[in-house]
Amino acid sequence: MKPFLILFTFISFSVFSQNNPQWMRYSTISPDGTQIVFTYKGDLYKVNSTGGDAQQLTYHNAHDYMAVWNKDGSKIAFASNRYGNFDIYVMSSNGGQATRLTFHSNDEHPYSFSANNKEVVFGALRQDASNHRQYPHGSQSELYSVPAETGKVSQLLTIPAEAVNFSRNGEIMIYHDKKGGENKWRKHHTSAITRDIWMHNTKTNVHTMITSNTAEDRQPVFSKNEKNIYF
């Protein structure tokens, strides 16, 4: 009787654990608001924004995370360490074969697709400008893009610009800065190096600071009419 009770308890606990998963992270909502992609135990899943059963998108022993949608919701880009470090991959938002886009030895993490869906914009520590006044630092990445169908990587900015989003016409890029190497998970952080929101006009190459305070301002997104920014 005792072995049966132990087995029953174990099965009950396993079923309960599967029905109440924890640590579902890095969620990102589709452009039309109907689907959410998230990371759970190193794989990507997709679920209706109204709830329901989640569909597993990746099945790999590597860690897949930080997914971002393209503008029509047909594809997602994500980071995966399938070859030792985190590279950029792209795949159908319905699952299937993932295509590797980057092959650098340093970690790379996607932020968004370009306005025309042709490029994936990502952050990485690859190459500082030759006239940079400060020695390259591991916490200060640069901004790059790579064709969504594979191709040559291009550097967009030599300064840290994270959580990038573009306006529909591609002329305005919003992002948060990174002034130093503070732990991004630090709670109630206030200091001189907290992140602020910026706007970059890609036509005039002008950067405009939107917020300036000692609290953390992060992850800006445009409102539907692009007249406001949420962060």
Regions found by a protein language model. Give the residues of each.
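N-terminal signal peptide c-region/cleavage motif recognized by signal peptidases
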Residues: S12-S14
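Positively charged n-region of N-terminal signal peptides that target proteins for export
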Residues: M1-F4
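Short, conserved catalytic or interaction motifs in soluble domains
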Residues: S49
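NTP/phosphate- and nucleic-acid-binding module
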Residues: P147
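A flexible loop/linker signature enriched in serine peptidases of the S9 family
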Residues: N19-P21, T39-Y45, D53, T58-Y65, ...
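Short N-terminal segments immediately surrounding and downstream of signal-peptide cleavage
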Residues: N19-G33
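Short coil/turn segments that connect the beta-strands within blades of beta-propeller domains
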Residues: D32-T34, D72-S74, N116-K118, N169-E171, ...
